[in-house]
């Protein structure tokens, strides 16, 4: 089972520079003193910038008990102990409100102070600063900035206008956890000074629009943070083409009808200098020998590699680098985690946070399907190693059950002499960026199998693509744009479309049990979760709960896509055996990856939103 422990990632005091900047942050019934610290962040060509962090002077690490358990009610001492604390109860949820306000109040004060220090005019704040609200966690910056401007003598009407020209909102996902709705009594307890402003902002919306669905405060007396961002921000963007279209046409359609000019797309990108130059220097050196070093500054120059897609000498060198990285991963996992890999097997990797919509459970069901095939004598042409890297949110029970299933399969298969020579399951411990830098260059295949319409973008898909892994995926998130760039032959697409999925939800017509009853492969795989073999290595409570979830609910529709997923996996494994054709797919993916550089993303944000 997953067990959480604290990660003191800033334990070296040399990382942090304590500054003289401090603020008194006002909460309902008490104040807290904050202190600003700076971390120098190294950028391209040894340039640096500063990351400003705020801490509470009174934080007390002795509050932490077993794992990450701590006293959630002692706000003065626990406020900055843990990012995203367990929110399975009201104590954890209101702690998030305190944390979010602490962050935005400090940031808002810093913005105002720095504007004034530069001789700026707060009446023209939008000419000096842009606040990009990422998801709804920082949304209280809108009423807080209004409050601070009013404290300095600016009337409410003008303060609202100023802030509405200063703040922009990025929606990163349509999942409920990122579209926060805070009960009014939470806010009245934690940040009562904001409530008159929030009431006024809502009043203006209600007077202007008859549609109750766009109100900031709903009939259940909850404050919809995304609604506030949309009404009082000047830009709303999604993070991949499909995601933005879903926002406009479905999830936020009522707002799009009101403010079509505010909506725009900014497809995510990755720091390709980390995910290619840093973590795969051998591949970088090969590319430099072929096309020069211009791609190190401009990732779109990787397109020049397209000239070599039929050059077998180059293709062999790419395969040689991949094999070397696979051997490196084998050695690294053996030394650090005691995991033994077969470097001649196919490395089929899925690394991302554990969430039902990302459907690690479907990959696990495929492992069960393949286990049965091998038991029946149908052996793969080449051994397969299925590698998972994931962490579940502490309170996300089903996600933890999926991790438990994967760990059980790992143990069961490793001890089976009939199956283990041909199939291996690995769940790497404590998945993080350091591990990703080893896993991604070594991957042959990467899994991007989220339920269509649920993944806003994804970025692991881009990192794998840049390192020459080939994707199996749904038409979701940035997979859609990847498919447009590389074409049908160089990505393996399966599954229902986002339109079909959205229609299922609208009609409430999906019944998981009907797939179980009518498909022998599905029934056999799901039944195996609670089989005697699995119970011998696993925990009955976890396995039975996951079994019942898949059989009776399956909210993220694992089963409708399963048979096509199985068929697509078999096709991708078969295609892997033509090594030159596979190397060509690798090179096409790499040559088309330049678009997904964060340099391009940031330039588009600046051109269309920030105007810096």
Regions found by a protein language model. Give the residues of each.
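A conserved ligand/cofactor-binding region detector
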Residues: 1-612
